[in-house]
A protein has these predicted regions:
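Metal-coordinating catalytic core of metallo-dependent amide/deamination hydrolases
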Residues: 18-151
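His/Asp/Glu-enriched, well-ordered alpha-helical/loop segment
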Residues: 137-140, 144, 184-269, 283-287
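Active-site microenvironment of metallo-dependent hydrolases
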Residues: 235-335
Length: 335
């Protein structure tokens, strides 16, 4: 469903941080096959955590390592792997060492960092270090590592992130929905940190995230004239730069040799529209649901709002039945 909804809202590239501790082995391969079938570009990882016990933790580490090996062998330009980790308060030093050993320098890491203050308190109380410092101690940081959230990072941690070339992804709707704070986007951006925009699965509409990111930064800083350049750069420039760390094609631009990722929006402007004010039209006038056609790597995935080569009704029926089955098993009732 994630992939179908992404196509319908003009998304061509997905970085997914997966967890399903009831079924670990082979899950990333299964997701990769669906991504391939539907035609999107995907960078996948499994969420390593100690919270379900050592056996599950070791399985999660192996799932990441196995999928990295699979991607190395497949050499598919539409598929990539990154090593996943949950929040630091569920990962011990021993587990970090195991992750680094299993990865063996092949990829970066995709991990939740300082999403809530409990992550900071846990690191200080149990390890005597703040979260970003712990990651640095274990060799997790670097130009191919993505830190999700980074709401409660201090200035010293920001400098470490900058010095190591580590990437940060802001997830504004998720953070506001969980009432855990607002990412210090302006401070991170000012330091030259590669800062992208994500969703944390809250939505598949990146234009929705764009609007919320702008409003949240202005509200947090009590200034009505900040954030415009930062949030538009994050979505339209930096996300492509992050994608290029893991995929071989040039992304996010229309020029010879670049990936042919193109969307057509059903939008009628009521004020003059040009390259000088397109950001304003996208923030205030457009939503992902206005996407009419989606093309990824030159392949048309949706044309005139009709998915190409996909029976959407059949897919939706299958997903609904799977959801009913899952809910039934969890709640011991029939839906």
């Amino acid at each position: 469903m994630l992939y179908i909804d992404s196509i319908k809202q003009g998304v061509t590239t997905v970085f997914d941080h997966h967890a399903s501790y009831g079924e670990i082995p082979g899950t990333l391969h299964t997701i990769a096959e669906e991504s391939k079938r539907l035609g999107l570009r995907s960078c996948l990882c499994y969420e390593v955590s100690d919270r379900d016990g050592e056996e599950k933790c070791l399985q999660a580490i192996k799932e990441n390592a196995d999928f990295i090996s699979e991607c190395e062998q497949r050499k598919d330009p539409m598929l990539a792997a990154i090593f996943g980790g949950h929040a630091l308060f569920t990962i011990s030093d021993k587990t970090f060492d195991r992750m680094v050993e299993a990865n063996n320098g092949r990829t970066g890491y995709h991990i939740h960092v300082s999403e809530g203050m409990n992550d900071v308190y846990d690191s200080l109380q149990n390890y005597g270090r703040r979260p970003v410092q712990r990651l640095q101690d274990h060799g997790i940081l670097g130009p191919k590592t993505i830190l999700g959230h980074c709401i409660h990072v201090n200035t010293a941690e920001m400098e470490i992130i900058k010095e190591t070339g580590t990437m940060v992804v802001n997830n504004p709707e998720s953070n506001m929905g969980n009432a855990i704070g607002i990412c210090p986007v302006l401070q991170l951006y000012k330091r030259g940190i590669l800062l992208g925009m994500g969703t944390d699965a809250y939505t598949n509409d990146m234009l929705e995230s764009l609007k919320v990111a702008l409003c949240s930064q202005r509200s947090q800083n009590c200034l009505p004239n900040v954030g415009w350049c930062e949030v538009t750069d994050m979505l339209f420039k930096n996300n492509a730069k992050i994608g290029e760390k893991y995929f071989p094609d040039t992304l996010g631009v229309l020029k010879p040799g670049a990936a042919a990722d193109i969307i057509v929006m059903d939008y009628k402007p009521f004020t003059p529209f040009s390259d000088e004010n397109i950001d304003g039209h996208m923030i205030f006038g457009m939503t992902g649901r206005q996407c009419q056609t989606t093309i990824a790597a030159g392949k048309t995935l949706m044309l005139d709002r009709q998915l190409v080569g996909i029976d959407e009704e059949a897919e939706n029926a299958h997903i609904l039945e799977a959801a009913k089955k899952l809910w039934g098993e969890l709640n011991h009732r029939t839906y």
